[in-house]
Regions:
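Divalent metal-binding pocket/active-site signature
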Residues: 1-10
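A conditional alpha-helix N-cap/helix-loop micro-motif detector
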Residues: 4-5, 30-33
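His/Asp/Glu-enriched, well-ordered alpha-helical/loop segment
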Residues: 10-29, 36, 41-122
């Protein structure tokens, strides 16, 4: 994806500038840097952000290896990676409530995080 620049805003600029577009964030502390979470809320406004979990069925399970679509994933702490490539995220092992808590820990006001996790997706 091309970067957002002042002369060629690209897809990010188009998304921010289009009122009907919503931004979905996997706010697990792994997929997206906290500053990007804050910037997204600032650019789109709390009414246009949706928190999602991308939660795998290994969510809540202890660290270890788990089957995933004919492949194997490794869960270690809050991180799920492909067993054959530890640099590739397999998904998230954080619940939506955990994502909401992360958003608040990143500086998103509680009311905005609750809205993004409940009202906006509905």
């Amino acid at each position: 994806m091309p970067p957002f620049t002042h002369r060629a805003p690209g897809v990010i600029g188009a998304a921010v500038d289009t009122p009907g577009v919503r931004a979905e964030l996997i706010c697990d502390g792994i997929h997206i840097h906290p500053s990007v979470v804050r910037a997204t809320f600032a650019l789109f406004g709390a009414e246009r952000v949706i928190l999602i979990s991308d939660s795998l069925r290994a969510t809540g399970m202890p660290d270890g290896k788990y089957p995933f679509g004919g492949q194997e994933i490794v869960v270690c702490g809050n991180r799920a990676t492909m067993a054959d490539d530890p640099n590739t995220l397999a998904g998230s092992v954080t619940s939506l409530m955990g994502c909401l808590r992360q958003a608040v820990s990143f500086g998103i006001p509680l009311a905005d995080a609750v809205r993004a996790a409940s009202y906006n997706p509905a």
